[in-house]
Amino acid sequence: MTTKIYILNGPNLNRLGKREPQIYGHETLEMLKNRCLEKASSLGLEIDFRQTNFEGVLIESVHEATDLGVGGIIINPAGLTFTSVALMDALKMFEGPKVELHISNVHQREPVYHDSLVSAPVTAVMAGFGTDGYLLALEWIKGRAR
């Protein structure tokens, strides 16, 4: 049986490749998804790769992962990282490994990006690896997935 990992992407990540490429690079979300699918396959994992601009939809995806007992969650909450108590609470309910991921090093950016509400309930935090962080997170989570 293949372990399923949810990769959840928050607001504005559908604009990868267009939005601030000097920070986020030129790779589109579709290109990133394809790289993640390829990496997951090589690791013997199955992924469900999602993006939404809506807080409630992201929270419902975490609830779904919890209810289905998926192997792990990799989440880039984007701007919701710093504002969403509800997302933080949803992540507390998921008992498997959880990685908070950011493409840029949020700690080198403006102060508004320094205080994550999502970091407390997750297992690990990755930031500053560019989109390669997603591939590294898949490698890390493989050995810890339930």
List each model region and its residues.
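Extreme N-terminal starter segment of soluble prokaryotic enzymes
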Residues: 1-5
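Mobile beta-alpha loop/short-helix "lid" or hinge segments that flank ligand
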Residues: 6-12, 103-117
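Glycine- and acidic-residue-enriched helix-capping/strand-helix junction motifs
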Residues: 16-30
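Short, electropositive alpha-helical surface patch
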Residues: 57-73
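Short beta-strand elements at the ligand-binding edges of bilobed clamshell
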Residues: 113-131
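Short beta->alpha junction loops
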Residues: 48-56
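A charged, well-structured terminal subsegment
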Residues: 127-146
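Mid-chain, well-packed structural core segment of small domains
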Residues: 70-106
